[in-house]
From Swiss-Prot:
It comes from Gibberella zeae (strain ATCC MYA-4620 / CBS 123657 / FGSC 9075 / NRRL 31084 / PH-1) (Wheat head blight fungus). PANTHER family: NADPH DEHYDROGENASE C23G7.10C-RELATED. It is an enzyme of class 1 (oxidoreductase). Its EC number is 1.6.-.-. Coiled coil: none annotated. One of its GO terms (molecular function) is NADPH dehydrogenase activity. Substrate binds at Y58, H211, A212, A213, H214. This is NADH:flavin oxidoreductase FG08077. CDD domains: OYE_YqiM_FMN. InterPro entries: Aldolase_TIM, OxRdtase_FMN_N, YqjM-like.
Length: 413
């Protein structure tokens, strides 16, 4: 008896066997929604517009990603976000938020991250990495241990080597007073961002994101709350955005033209909306300034601006009025300012499929979710179910819902 030859074809390029995913998980197969409409950036096509936001795991050893990162991200990646983003990754050893943060300040840190990109690509998925420096918010302990405690030397911290644009503590009397950056420090910082971006490309990442939000170093340069310099990196708006643009220019000039660059910004420090805080912080980073920056970024090769908020001072958390989609209005203001010159994503409290669809239908290009993916790695399928559409899942998962033989097969070459 002759049998039809049906092969469980292997994914191309993977160093181990795993079934090919064609089309990739997260691809809409029936129905019509904006959430599951593909988007192409610099020739890179993402199967849907629900992106995984970066999520710090505080689980690395000396900056080296571990099996936790592979399994945590892998469980989400295989279920099909349009793009998955690795957590804030330090470009300098002393730029970590905690001693357990991931880093890319040395070549040895490439290989553990390459395991993650290799897995993502074996599933026909796209993956990016967020490059960061914590500045005056460095050398903290993991957030489940304390709200704002400093990591002492005894637990691997570096409280005597914290740096920032100006010698102003994150919280007076709680955090150490940082050392103000010298001009030489700034040059080294720019070169280290570039070196980390090059390592990210070597590690196989499809997308690079620059972290200029949440009160970390680049946000510290942007905001007058933390930047009181009197040289060309402080004072005026043009001076405060200078280091961000210089870093972007260096990276854009050295990485492949086909690699998208994203920039995450805090649209506001939130002090502009509250009279109590406005008196204490008469000058801060505002939505108006964010819109102005967002209009400049595409001229420097940025493809998407991710709009978040807050983080510059503990009191900004008090000023935030959190709730469902609480940052979407900020993203809408940015999108109105930039038009079609650059893509804009919204993040924060977007925890249902209907809400995500509403945000995208309003003109935002991409929605991102962080905690909700952490709570439910199958968020893509959950959103699709809510919206009444079908999306492809990994074959190993999909068949158990659709039945045997429903995906068809391709003959072996």
């Amino acid at each position: 008896m002759a049998y039809e030859i049906i092969d469980n074809i292997a994914a191309e390029g993977a160093p181990y066997y795993t079934p090919a995913q064609d089309p990739p998980a997260g691809t809409q197969t029936s129905g019509s929604t904006k959430v599951f409409t593909p988007i192409t950036i610099r020739g890179v096509t993402f199967p849907n517009r629900l992106f995984l936001a970066p999520l710090c795991q505080y689980s690395a050893k000396d900056g080296y990603a571990t099996d936790w990162h592979l399994t945590h991200l892998g469980g989400i990646i295989q279920r099909g976000p349009g793009l998955s983003m690795v957590e804030a990754t330090a470009v300098q050893n002393h730029g970590r938020i905690t001693p357990q943060d991931v880093g890319l300040w040395e070549d040895g840190q490439i290989e553990p991250l390459k395991r993650i990109t290799t897995f993502a690509h074996s599933q026909s998925q796209k993956i990016g990495i967020q490059l960061s420096h914590a500045g005056r918010k460095a050398s903290c302990v993991s957030p489940w241990l304390s709200i704002n405690a400093v990591a002492a030397k005894e637990v691997g911290g570096w409280p005597d080597n914290i740096v920032a644009p100006s010698a102003i503590a994150q919280e007076a009397g709680v955090n150490p007073v940082p050392k103000a950056f010298t001009k030489e420090d700034i040059e080294e910082l720019k070169n280290d961002f570039l070196a980390a971006a090059k390592r990210a490309i070597r590690a196989g990442f499809d997308v690079i994101e620059i972290h200029a939000a949440h009160g970390y170093l680049l946000h510290q340069f942007l905001s007058p709350v933390s930047n009181q310099r009197t040289d060309e990196y402080g004072g005026s708006f043009e001076n405060r955005i200078r280091v961000v643009l210089e870093i972007i220019d260096l990276i854009r000039g050295e990485i492949p033209e086909t690699t998208p660059i994203l920039v995450r910004v805090s649209a506001t420090d939130w002090f502009e909306y509250d009279a109590q805080f406005k008196d204490e912080f008469p000058e801060s980073w505002t939505v108006e300034q964010t819109c102005k920056l967002a209009q400049i970024l595409p001229k420097h090769g940025v493809d998407l601006v991710d709009v978040s908020s807050g983080g510059i001072h503990p009191k900004s958390a008090i000023a935030i009025k959190a709730g469902p989609a609480y940052q979407v209005d900020l993203a809408k203001q940015v999108k109105k300012a930039v038009g079609d010159s650059v893509l804009v994503s919204a993040v924060g409290g977007i925890k249902t499929g209907h809400l995500a669809e509403e945000v995208l239908q309003s003109g935002i290009d991409v929605v991102r979710a962080g905690r909700w993916f952490q709570q439910n790695p199958g968020l893509v399928r959950a959103f699709a179910n809510e919206l009444g559409v079908e999306v492809k899942m990994a074959n190993q998962i999909d068949w158990s819902f659709k039945g045997r033989g429903k995906n068809g097969h391709k003959k072996s070459p």
